[in-house]
Design a protein with these regions (language model features):
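Accessory alpha-helical/coil subdomains and C-terminal extensions
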Residues: 22-23, 31-36, 42-57, 74-224
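Glycine-rich nucleotide/cofactor/substrate-binding loop typically near the N-terminus or early
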Residues: 1-27
Length: 225
């Protein structure tokens, strides 16, 4: 859905809903399947309420498809798209880890997921990554870039203690959703936002950003990685 539907049916908002349902009535649409994630399911709920309020006999059905895996489905079932995204992401992550091991380097990669860390965690777990950073880790403390960098540095140091001079970290893009405006401004990140008010994270190279900051911190600590 390219446009977020208003939460009520009053005034001009009602006109918008009437325009949508005029199309349904014109083509006698009685079954409407909407495939998507959180915003799409929100749209399904609003259209269903309007159909019930206006007495239009229609079945509006939401099909939960999102790689974020953040829709509460019965029996904790994963959303459509999550497992395939995790599998494909794991293929890439394994290749990155092989490169790290054979070259003696550390690499940082990011995974999609908006405000949820399921995809990053699933990929990292499948590939036994030594460091996985997801927003859910910070449920009792504000997320800051410094904390994320400290986590990665600690993983590097711990592996060096056991003579493992390589590794990889996967970071969920969701951490960007939880950063304060002051934190974002201090690091020079400027987001554009979509019609639903979500930052367009695809336009920012998260992995390169954290890799650059990690390099700076390691240089300050005189750790040659």
């Amino acid at each position: 859905c390219r446009k977020k539907l208003p939460p009520d049916f009053d005034g001009e908002h009602r006109i918008l809903y009437e325009e949508i349902f005029s199309v349904f009535r014109e083509y006698d649409i009685r079954y409407f399947f909407y495939i998507g994630g959180n915003d799409s399911m929100d749209t399904v709920a609003k259209l269903s309420r309007f159909a019930a309020e206006t007495g239009y006999d229609m079945r509006i059905i939401g099909v939960p498809k999102t790689i974020d895996n953040d829709l509460p489905l019965p029996d904790c079932a994963p959303t459509f798209g999550y497992e395939s995204a995790k599998d494909k992401g794991a293929v890439i992550a394994r290749a990155v880890y092989v490169d790290a091991r054979t070259s003696g380097n550390w690499f940082v990669m990011s995974a999609m997921g908006r405000s949820a860390g399921h995809l990053a965690f699933g990929i990292g777990e499948a590939c036994h990554y030594p460091m996985i950073v997801i927003p859910e880790m910070f449920n009792k403390t504000p997320i800051t870039i410094d904390k994320i960098i400290r986590l990665m540095v600690s993983s590097i140091v711990k592996r060096r203690i056991v003579s493992m001079d390589y590794g990889a970290a996967v970071i969920s893009e969701g951490v960007f959703h939880e950063l304060s405006e002051a934190e974002l401004s201090s690091c020079g990140i400027h987001f554009t936002y979509d019609a639903h008010g979500h930052p367009e994270l695809g336009k920012v190279s998260k992995a390169c950003f954290f890799s650059m900051l990690l390099d700076q911190r390691l240089a300050e600590l005189k750790l040659n990685v």
